[in-house]
């Protein structure tokens, strides 16, 4: 689905409305969503949609972020109109922005970020109250040079600052995967202990 198309956003909102109305649920959770991760020698071709629906004359990047913001707000509004107690949360990529690109960002050097590459302004969603919780996918080890787990779990906890709940997404699938940092039997228990101590 192309987030730039109003009918795509309405389609998703209608599905969420149906689920929320018909079932006794505690929440709706989105995981890996919206614009695709970059693939070498491939582009997401939404030029025609951009030209047709960019009525605010935004740059392509800002327009894409605005589309995703509209999806998130529309889903939240849909849920809260039907059942205000049902939680809405998202599990985004683990880095919102690098500090080198935005002083509010984390002290990381990630090649992919939510804001710049995936067009997901998770900080805005938190600030606007559009999500009840966030589960950042912090899939790096402590001490990783590009994206240190310790830096990131603290950044998300501090940024959210009670505006939304934070539950860390751990990379359990990487344990014993062959890399030195993930073959360390203490890495995952240590990450869990750090997050619990920061609660």
Q: What are these regions, as identified by a protein language model?
A:
Residues 2-6, 58-65, 141-142, 178-181:
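Second-shell loop/turn segments in exported
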Residues 119-145, 156-199:
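Substrate-binding cleft of secreted/luminal carbohydrate-active enzymes
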């Amino acid at each position: 689905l192309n987030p730039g198309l109003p009918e795509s956003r309405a389609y998703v909102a209608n599905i969420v409305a149906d689920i929320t109305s018909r079932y006794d649920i505690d929440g709706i959770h989105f995981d890996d969503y919206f614009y695709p991760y970059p693939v070498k020698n491939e582009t997401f071709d939404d030029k025609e949609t951009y030209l047709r629906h960019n009525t605010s004359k935004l740059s392509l990047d800002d327009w894409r972020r605005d589309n995703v913001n509209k999806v998130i707000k529309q889903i939240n509004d849909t849920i809260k109109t039907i059942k205000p107690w049902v939680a809405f949360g998202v599990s985004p990529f683990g880095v919102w922005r690098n500090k080198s690109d935005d002083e509010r960002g984390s002290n990381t050097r990630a090649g992919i970020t939510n804001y710049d590459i995936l067009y997901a302004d998770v900080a805005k969603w938190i600030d606007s109250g559009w999500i009840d919780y966030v589960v950042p996918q912090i899939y790096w080890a402590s001490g990783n040079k590009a994206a240190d787990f310790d830096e990131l779990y603290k950044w998300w906890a501090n940024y959210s600052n009670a505006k939304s709940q934070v539950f860390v997404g751990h990379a359990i699938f990487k344990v014993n995967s062959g890399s030195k940092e993930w073959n360390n039997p203490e890495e995952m228990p240590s990450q869990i202990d750090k997050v619990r101590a920061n609660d």
